[in-house]
Amino acid sequence: MNGIFLVNKKAGLTSHDIVYQIRKKFNIKKVGHTGTLDPFATGLLIILVGKATKLAFLFDELDKQYDGTIVLGKSYDTDDTTGEVINEAPVSFTEDDLKAILNRIVPTYKQIPPSYSAIKKAGVKAYEAARSGKPLDLPAREVSIYNFTYQINKQTIDFSTHVSKGTYIRSIARDIGLGLNTFGALSVLNRTNIDAYSQNMSKTVEDTELPDLIDHALLFEGVKKIVLNDYLIKLVKNGVVLDERQTTLNEPFIVQDEMGNYIAYYVPDNQQYKLKYLF
């Protein structure tokens, strides 16, 4: 069993809880995920199983889409409403004020990650430092917000957004609050899409069954293929580096045997090609 499950995570569960539940349900030793969802968040979580646990790199650069709610007037140490309140301020703003803030952060801005995050600095995880009372001074990182639609409801803002990898929605909530001369925190978050993978395609762990597995070969449908003879296939299975004698492609490709079976996935590397994944 090698591939991915699209799981619809419930609130209150960690991403590791989902990994454990899938491992236990299907009696699979190798299980992982492609990107953490906070425990209070819901929505799409891509679970890797079997050999596909080595394919997380395929998902690293993918955009994500979310729905959520921002609560204004209070700041929390976690930048979401599961944390401790650390500041309060009155809320008074117009839609034009909100539009002005969005014009500053859409389509790109320098974002400081939340103190409670898994980012490491000098080998220390930010959330561990924050819990010890010594939060890290995290550098700002450029992120992209491709779209941000909203509905204002007095002291809350319901929104839908499409963002680049590495974007923290909690930080967006915090920064919108500060831009409105108050505070902001995330109270609801639901991940609806990871690139072409949709929450509508996902199931809860309880409803997930073996036929829902997307085979790892299907993750490479749009990738170029080359066919090698039996002698070279044996070398490929041992991790041999390929070069211009086998192909001149300047992009990743699948190696197939003469029967059309997927054998390996290779990527360009200094005018050669190195093995990235064995089927």
Swiss-Prot record:
Disulfide bonds: none annotated. This is tRNA pseudouridine synthase B. The keyword Isomerase applies. It comes from Acholeplasma laidlawii (strain PG-8A). Belongs to the pseudouridine synthase TruB family. Type 1 subfamily. The keyword Isomerase applies. Responsible for synthesis of pseudouridine from uracil-55 in the psi GC loop of transfer RNAs. CDD domains: PseudoU_synth_EcTruB. The active site is at D38.
